[in-house]
């Protein structure tokens, strides 16, 4: 046990990880990086395949005991909980380019890792949507919109961007809070405590935003079904930009709020620079 440096001191029982380098060429030769990318690909494939199948199934059974909005929300939230629990120790369990983007801004992952993750997530999402299409058949898949995200009638593009931004803010803020080094040190004996709030955040965001955008909050999840449904020919494709702009803006805002306001990184940096500067 580390001793305090002075009487009455209360040393931290955790240690903040060092910031990741923006470019770490050394990790490019490590199998662990590619194993993590494979985990991101597989997890995103499963996420999109199962969640999109739930949406299509609900539309097919509408009025006949379909899952409904609550069932879809539980499918997404529960699946995120399971997949984060399974992959967090390998890749961090991002499954979402917006989450990966926020981690780059927070200096938790390097740019090469983020680029590889994002590529794996997008390819996994396309493969997951393709698998869902194979499960339901091309006709049923197209007839029920392929589970793709699109702006609901009566809502403006601006409203869609705001909904996606707010929803992603909630998700990424929860991710940062659940994986905070201080909380991880305190709750390390209960390994489900990080995936659980993340899954619940996804659930409640779906309840709030399904009526507006169908809930994207994940650019890869929106890209996969839109591509499989038809490149450049569908409403989902024309609305796709909403599901990239909103989530990336929300992710950046959540990182700034958690890292610089709640964690006080800006104040610490200012205090450190003031301490090092000469005084006259």
From Swiss-Prot:
Q: Which Gene3D superfamilies match?
A: Glycerol uptake facilitator protein
Report keywords, A-Z: Cell membrane, Membrane, Repeat, Transmembrane, Transmembrane helix, Transport
A single cellular component GO annotation: plasma membrane
Where it mainly occurs, coarsely classed, is membrane
Tissue specificity of this protein: Expressed in leaves and at lower levels in roots.
Q: Which InterPro entries match?
A: Aquaporin-like, Aquaporin_transptr, MIP, MIP_CS
* Stretches that traverse the bilayer: 36-56, 70-92, 113-135, 156-176, 192-212, 236-256
Q: Where is this region: Disordered?
A: 1-21
- GO MF term (any one): water channel activity
Q: Does the keyword Membrane apply?
A: yes
- Top-level taxon in the UniProt lineage: Eukaryota
Q: Where in the cell is it found?
A: Cell membrane
Motif NPA 2, residue numbers:
218-220
Q: Which Pfam families match?
A: MIP (PF00230)
Task: Give start-end ranges for motif NPA 1.
Answer: 96-98
How does the UniProt record describe the way this protein sits in the membrane? Multi-pass membrane protein
NCBIfam families annotated for this entry?
MIP (TIGR00861)
What is the annotated role of this protein in its UniProt record? Answer: Aquaporins facilitate the transport of water and small neutral solutes across cell membranes.
Q: What is known of its domains?
A: Aquaporins contain two tandem repeats each containing three membrane-spanning domains and a pore-forming loop with the signature motif Asn-Pro-Ala (NPA).
- What is the similarity comment for this entry? Belongs to the MIP/aquaporin (TC 1.A.8) family. PIP (TC 1.A.8.11) subfamily.
Its recorded name reads Probable aquaporin PIP2-8
Query: Gene for this protein?
Result: PIP2-8
């Amino acid at each position: 046990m580390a001793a305090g440096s002075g009487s009455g001191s209360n040393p931290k029982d955790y240690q903040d990880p060092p910031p990741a380098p923006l470019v770490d060429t050394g990790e490019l030769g490590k199998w662990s990086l590619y194993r993590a990318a494979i985990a991101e690909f597989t997890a995103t494939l499963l996420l999109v395949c199962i969640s999109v199948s739930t949406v299509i199934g609900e539309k097919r059974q509408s009025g006949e005991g379909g899952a409904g909005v609550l069932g879809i929300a539980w499918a997404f939230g529960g699946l995120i909980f399971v997949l984060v629990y399974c992959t967090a120790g390998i890749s961090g369990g991002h499954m979402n380019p917006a989450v990966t983007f926020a981690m780059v801004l927070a200096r938790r992952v390097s740019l090469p890792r983020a680029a590889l993750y994002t590529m794996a997530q997008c390819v996994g999402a396309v493969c997951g949507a393709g698998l869902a299409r194979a499960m339901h058949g091309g006709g049923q898949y197209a007839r029920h919109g392929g589970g793709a995200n699109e702006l609901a009638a009566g809502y403006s593009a601006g409203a869609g961007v705001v909904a996606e931004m707010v929803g992603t803010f909630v998700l990424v803020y929860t991710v940062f809070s659940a994986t905070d080094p201080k909380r991880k040190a305190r709750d390390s004996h209960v390994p489900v405590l990080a995936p659980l709030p993340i899954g619940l955040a996804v659930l409640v965001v779906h309840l709030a935003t399904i009526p507006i955008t169908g809930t994207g909050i994940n650019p890869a999840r929106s890209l996969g079904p839109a591509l499989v449904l038809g490149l450049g020919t569908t409403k989902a494709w024309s609305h796709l930009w909403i599901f990239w702009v909103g989530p990336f803006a929300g992710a950046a805002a959540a990182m700034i709020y958690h890292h610089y306001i709640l964690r006080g990184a800006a104040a610490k940096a200012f205090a450190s620079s003031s301490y090092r500067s000469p005084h006259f």
